[in-house]
């Protein structure tokens, strides 16, 4: 409601002169309901009077699957869950009451999932019953076919976290929200409005239903009501948020003591708040060192006396500040020392680019120490193992190694499951939730939790966290050795999921990893790739190759790079 607040971040802008237009008009209707399964009550929410009206009782034995089936058996449904574990559990529970559909497209899609992901993957079983779930990385071809099947009405119901709901425009008639939490924190009004905006899309329908469902006693009724009734509040820039401001004095204390790890702040703040406060601290130290007047420095000004400012400036001169707010000076110094000592990425050997697994684990453990993952990444790559310190890093190394070698998803999952078989005491985890102390290789549910976790690791750890740290290592390596480019750059390998130059070229041209692997298969390579004057060209027949993902991507790439295609 107040976008002008962000102009305060820009110097010499007169905010009083800003003009804005706000509208509450919407071309579609949304009907919102609150279903309290714990109390057995159903309510309709009136958006105009901002009130709840009781519309009936809910049978005590009713579960989420009963509600979804009763309301949306002939409609398109999206069920939002706040964790990957719940996505899988709720989807399986719901689909268990549905018959298998005799539909060729669903049967074909289910078979491809078994081949490309895993034979025991719940997703394949669910697809045949008109249900799907989304918990992380999926091959492009499968993801697009799931979305198309939903648009076509063959798939009726998708269970997912906020990632898919917010990122895809799907024609849902009903949205079921099973929690007011997004991960480990409560949803705010903006997140809620963005979530409910997924139903009632003018392209597909003129109205949609939103069902907020309270399924656990620990979830507070008032929090659901607040989301329904509260307007989006005026926004503050993050440094001025109450949750952040109350810790600013601790930031000053830590910095005055020369503590860039912000020990006091870390002990007092939540992980999410600490991440933001750490970035503020890095900007603040640079502002003081360079004597810059910025909104960040002004936010600290009332908490800063001459003595504190002097100590901070003394502890953090310009050369001890960082231009990258994701990495502090101490991390950068540690990294430079590591690279100058001769550290390189693990070597690739032989025709198949073999990597010594223990060498890779050792390299990752060195990065863990350099970048202080145990402090800054303690929920993922910095987490200590339950039976040995490096067991979590070893688990990620298994997936990382298969990823950069260009293995398909089924191979990556196969090796992830094999690792768990050999190390059952590493337990069964989905995100930060421990599902079992010991992995049981004969348990289909354990296998599917590992599959879900592996998909999440690829999307959130490999392609985000590890990729980012490898990027910094590669930049530092180039700087120390005065290189523009070097062989064996694992940052590239992670980004493209391969060490194969052809696959990297195709991805640089715009194809996804899976489509690139499809194109480079010997039979397809002969059909679709042609070398002209030393340059690789793509035959236009690829536009009708029969692979939905490849066809979709090829049309987009041809539009942007027509010179890449020939008849």
Each model region followed by its residue ranges:
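Conserved segment of the helicase C-terminal RecA-like domain
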Residues: 170, 174, 180-230
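Glycine-rich phosphate-binding "P-loop"
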Residues: 32-60, 127-134
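Conserved C-terminal RecA-like helicase domain
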Residues: 22-25, 58-157, 181-190
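Conserved nucleotide-binding/hydrolysis micro-motifs of P-loop NTPases
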Residues: 2-4, 26-29, 83-87, 139, ...
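C-terminal helicase module of SF1/SF2 nucleic-acid helicases/translocases
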Residues: 206-302
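A conserved mid-domain beta-alpha-beta active-site/ligand-binding segment of alpha/beta enzyme cores
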Residues: 48-71, 238-257
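Post-DEXD/H (motif II) to motif III coupling segment of the RecA-like Helicase ATP-binding lobe
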Residues: 1-31
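C-terminal accessory/interaction regions of large nucleic acid-associated machines
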Residues: 254-292, 310-567
């Amino acid at each position: 409601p107040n976008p002008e607040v962000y102009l305060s971040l820009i110097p010499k802008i007169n905010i009083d002169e800003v003009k804005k237009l706000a509208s509450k008009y919407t071309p579609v209707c949304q009907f919102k309901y609150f279903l309290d399964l714990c109390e057995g009550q159903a309510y309709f929410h009136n958006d105009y009077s901002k009130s709840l009206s009781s519309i009936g009782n809910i049978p005590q034995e009713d579960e989420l699957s009963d509600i979804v089936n009763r309301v949306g058996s002939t409609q398109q449904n999206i069920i939002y869950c706040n964790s990957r574990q719940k996505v899988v559990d709720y989807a399986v529970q719901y689909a268990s009451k549905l018959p298998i559909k005799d539909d060729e497209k669903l049967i074909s899609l289910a078979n491809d999932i078994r081949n490309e992901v895993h034979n025991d993957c719940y997703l394949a079983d669910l697809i045949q019953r008109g249900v799907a779930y989304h918990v992380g990385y999926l091959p492009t071809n499968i993801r697009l076919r799931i979305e198309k099947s939903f648009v076509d009405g063959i798939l009726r119901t998708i269970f997912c976290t906020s990632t898919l709901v917010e990122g895809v425009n799907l024609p849902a008639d009903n949205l079921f929200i099973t929690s007011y939490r997004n991960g480990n924190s409560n949803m705010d009004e903006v997140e809620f409005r963005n979530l409910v905006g997924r139903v009632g899309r003018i392209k597909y329908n003129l109205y949609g239903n939103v069902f907020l469902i309270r399924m656990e006693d620990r979830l507070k009724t008032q929090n659901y009501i607040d989301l329904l009734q509260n307007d989006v509040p005026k926004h503050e820039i993050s440094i001025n948020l109450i949750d952040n401001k109350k810790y600013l004095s601790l930031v000053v204390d830590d910095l005055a003591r020369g503590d860039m790890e912000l020990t006091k702040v870390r002990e007092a703040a939540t992980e999410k708040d600490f991440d933001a406060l750490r970035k503020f601290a890095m900007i603040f130290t640079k502002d003081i060192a360079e004597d810059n007047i910025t909104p960040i420095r002004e936010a600290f000004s009332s908490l800063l006396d001459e003595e504190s400012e002097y100590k901070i400036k003394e502890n953090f001169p310009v050369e001890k500040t960082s231009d990258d707010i994701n990495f502090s000076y101490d991390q950068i110094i540690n990294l430079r020392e590591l690279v100058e000592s001769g550290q390189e990425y693990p070597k690739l050997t032989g025709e198949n680019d073999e990597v010594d697994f223990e060498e890779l684990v050792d390299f990752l453990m060195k990065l863990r120490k350099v970048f202080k993952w145990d402090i800054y990444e303690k929920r993922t790559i910095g987490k200590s193992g339950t039976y040995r310190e490096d067991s979590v890093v070893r688990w990620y190394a298994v997936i990382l190694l298969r990823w950069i070698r260009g293995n398909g998803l089924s191979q990556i999952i196969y090796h992830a499951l094999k690792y768990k078989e050999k190390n059952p005491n590493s337990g069964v985890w989905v995100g930060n939730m421990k599902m079992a102390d010991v992995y049981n290789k004969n348990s289909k549910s354990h296998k599917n939790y590992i599959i879900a976790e592996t998909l999440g690791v690829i999307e959130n750890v490999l392609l985000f966290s590890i990729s980012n740290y490898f990027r910094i290592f590669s930049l530092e390596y180039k700087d120390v050795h005065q290189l523009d480019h070097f062989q064996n750059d694992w940052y590239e390998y992670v980004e493209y999921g391969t060490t194969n130059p052809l696959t990297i070229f195709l991805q640089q041209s715009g194809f996804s990893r899976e489509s690139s692997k499809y194109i480079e298969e010997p039979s397809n390579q002969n059909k679709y790739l042609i070398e002209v004057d030393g340059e690789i060209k793509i035959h236009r027949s690829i536009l009708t190759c029969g692979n939905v993902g490849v066809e979709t991507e090829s049309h987009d790439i041809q539009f942007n790079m027509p010179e890449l295609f020939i008849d």
